[in-house]
Amino acid sequence: MKQSKVFIPTMRDVPSEAEAQSHRLLLKAGLIKQSTSGIYSYLPLATRVLNNITAIVRQEMERIDSVEILMPALQQAELWEESGRWGAYGPELMRLQDRHGRQFALGPTHEELVTSIVRNELKSYKQLPMTLFQIQSKFRDEKRPRFGLLRGREFIMKDAYSFHADEASLDQTYQDMYQAYSRIFERVGINARPVVADSGAIGGSHTHEFMALSAIGEDTIVYSKESDYAANIEKAEVVYEPNHKHTTVQPIEKIETPNVKTAQELADFLGRPVDEIVKTMIFKVDGEYIMVLVRGHHEINDIKLKSYFGTDNIELATQDEIVNLVGANPGSLGPVIDKEIKIYADNFVQDLNNLVVGANEDGYHLINVNVGRDFNVDEYGDFRFILEGEKLSDGSGVAHFAEGIEVGQVFKLGTKYSESMNATFLDNQGKAQPLIMGCYGIGISRTLSAIVEQNHDDNGIVWPKSVTPFDLHLISINPKKDDQRELADALYAEFNTKFDVLYDDRQERAGVKFNDADLIGLPLRIVVGKRASEGIVEVKERLTGDSEEVHIDDLMTVITNKYDNLK
């Protein structure tokens, strides 16, 4: 394709709000154009890359007998009310109503809709298992869209849904999808690591995320260097081994702590280590207030709280609620209280006595507070995030951290949707049973960004061979010169029969063409320049920067060999 005919609006400067390298490069190389916050158009080069990604996804889905369908993005509220998610999903669900006042949502996922499609069709165990997938735009009303395609309000996704008669069948499909996802990410050129994860708003009993390692990743991966252990930090268990630091019990004492609001400020004020401070936070669990205690250097993990209490209906109490409940602001909370409120403490609080806690009075704290004498803990548990260097739950070693971008996730849904939506089948005994389900998503547009995050240098994108928008970049340095133009035209005609060629025939300076070529990042470059009359051209590899002069008689052989050896 001639570059003069392709819409590639490269930029010299990008908006300052473009934080991620992938966002900057996709804008700069003319692949995407922002319409408004979190919403982008995919221009010709990006569309070609997306087509290559989706072709790989389709191949791998068909390999495991997953069948493609296409469902509407617009979903009626009644389906979401059946599952209970219309009220539970939160403000991220894009809602609208038609002229008749009927409520709809622009789907972020399609569990409800696909369940409604099959519930009166998959009637017998003989029709199972069945796996359906689609590739479609999804919508999420992000509070703060950022990082370009990585956190947008409209995004492209491959979502698949499987239906089963028993858990063994679900396990098999889950493993098939897990392996298919591993192959997909390897094929598109992403270093992605599967990690144990939380199922979030989708629900289910078991899930893995596929995380593309990246410095700008919004998720932290906890992993072992001695085993295959890997988990999202939200799910990483903290191993508690008692390490009591008990000293002689001292009398409780109330002290003034003016303008002290954080655990670190309190530690500095008292001249004590922050890990000897105990923080108190108040949560509402199914409408009931509770206190949760952790040591000063630890952070409460609300995902673990949801798992511990078996409910998603957990939220941090607001400042007004806290003041009404205890008479003090959040920085002064403590467990010594004359109100009926259950107290839960992280396991590691047990290692301390003579605690330092808030006095439930602004500007004051209590020192030498002791469990059993001054207050009681209802239950201890693992309520916090793991720290780097702590022991891992599989016994393999210590926790190491890496940042990652979630590009895919697989879920075992069980009967969460089929029970609430009455999707049943007849088993081999003729009894009605709820369909057992799995769901599996890949962020296609996120994958595009993740590829760029992991495959770029200071000059631009470096496309992996499998997804590159074109195989070769043919550049005529000066098309006004007959020998250069004629040779470039001849090479374009020859190589276009075997490769996808982007032919830069523009009337631009050589520097502009070379800068754009580096920015766009096609794997191989053929430059027709001053030695055209001798039949000599330059061949350059984008990844290594290696270049050599080649006679046109040998060019097809050289290019074919180099292309075959590309990753």
From Swiss-Prot:
An example Gene Ontology molecular-function term: proline-tRNA ligase activity
Xref: Pfam families: HGTP_anticodon, tRNA-synt_2b, tRNA_edit
Reactions it catalyzes: tRNA(Pro) + L-proline + ATP = L-prolyl-tRNA(Pro) + AMP + diphosphate
Enzyme class: ligase
Subcellular location: Cytoplasm
EC number(s) per entry: 6.1.1.15
HAMAP family: Pro_tRNA_synth_type1
Entry protein name: Proline--tRNA ligase
Gene source species: Staphylococcus aureus (strain MRSA252)
